[in-house]
Amino acid sequence: MDKQIQMVQQIVDDMLAKRESLRVLEAGCGSRSFIQFGPKAYLVGIDISAEQLQKNNLLQEKILGDIQEFPLQAVNFDVVICWDVLEHLPQPEMALNNFLQTIKPGGIIVLGAPVVSSLKGLATKYTPHWLHVMLYRKVIGNPLAGTPGYGPFKTFLKSAMSPKGIRRFAVENHLRIDLLESFEGVMQQTVRRKYPLVDLVFRAVAPLVRVLSFGTVTPHTTDFIAVLRKPAPDARDRQAEPAFAGTTVLNTAH
């Protein structure tokens, strides 16, 4: 995931270089941020967990609320970041529409989430929550997993937050896709590295899964990252271009 974070960091750095300041919303902010913004940025975080907000020392402003329903001020932010949150929402399309109306022209929406159609995504969606907690404690090594304010949290993995759903959202709302890339996440990498037998079985089963699912299930790509840009007013005046024109779209999954 470091590569994907670096790609987003470069996009943010380019914005910082061209502007005197940035207003940034960390949606579902938790207690930390993956991206560095520096002194030019005013950071606002929203989360449903008071414990997570209390532990986050990077924010200038904290909002206790649900990103699906909280009335975010219109045209208010240059950057909206939503990382590993959409999968936990029963109505992710509500959050996406909330981001759309609060982002300024020329601003970006950064999304990171599991691939719904991956083996990890399907296993996460259809296995009990207690199993997720056990994996976080035993495999990742987080003894606080599942306690109040700590993940893993309940997941829904709705189709609206799949890479295909995000592409559709971008096209329908005239957003440019600056980046859309799928990759193998830390959890699966850790399990395969820590348990060689699991890795052996995975390597044997993965090709069969791809064939039997007609390519719709992606064993190796578990997560994706997307950067959607709201066109500036002058861009809207020019002749309309395809949503993918001049963008980086790599290794995407359905």
Predicted features and spans:
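Conserved phosphate-binding and hydrolysis motifs of nucleotide-dependent enzymes
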Residues: G28, G106-G107
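Intrinsically disordered, low-complexity segments enriched in proline/serine/threonine
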Residues: Q73, V116, W130, P233-A235, ...
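S-adenosyl-L-methionine-dependent methyltransferase catalytic module, highlighting the catalytic core
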Residues: P90-F99, I108-V227
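Short catalytic micro-motifs in class I SAM-dependent methyltransferases
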Residues: D84-H88
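Intrinsic disorder/low-complexity segments
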Residues: A232-H254
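Conserved N-terminal segment of class I S-adenosyl-L-methionine
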Residues: M1-V75, V79-W83, L96, S159-A160, ...
